Amino acid sequence: EDLELDTARLDNEGGNIHSGKTLHINTPELNNQGGSIDATAHHLQSTAINNENGHLIGRESLTLTSDGEKLNNRGGQIISKGKLDITAKDTSIDSSGGYIVGKNIAADVGSVSGGKIESWEELTLRAKKAEKMESVRSGRDMKIETQDKYSMTGQYYSGGEAVIRATGGLEFAPEGKFEFNENIKVSSDAYIINRGLLSS
């Protein structure tokens, strides 16, 4: 059934929270280190989120909203088998060794560092800064926008069209691997540097 949790602090370290239907969590501070929180429709609103080695799962949808400074997803997994919406425009996400996975992903964040972002269909990522990504993949169209310079160092794959815009400069790094199956549009107000292999 539906489950609603509204509290000043939710500590689920090593614990499990499960809802067969809709789960609403509203808390300024969430500690899900090594824990698991899953629901059919998962709505999470929190200022400070620690999901280190934890699991945040939406079996049909996951909506994550944060107005905090940091989201710790080191070694963690943020997964939706349907739509994954992340709205955290001023939040720095450390996803080193972690996963952000969904059928359709729309993420609007302050910054994201490390880890893998994989969408089975559409992927839209807007960030002031993105760095040290291990892999970014979409089964269909991919759209990435960053304000700062963006060095693409990991593996990038798009099954559809790819639109990549980095206002502060864009670099395809030599250690990066880039494969885009349809049209690719790359733009920057500053510069574009290619040190890798770019193919479409």
Q: What function would you assign to each model-found segment?
A:
Residues E1-A8, K21-P28, A41-A48, E60-D67, ...:
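Well-ordered beta-strand segments characteristic of repetitive beta-sheet solenoids
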Residues D11-H18, N31-D38, N50-I57, N72-I79, ...:
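Short, T/G/N/S-enriched strand-turn elements that build extracellular solenoid repeat scaffolds
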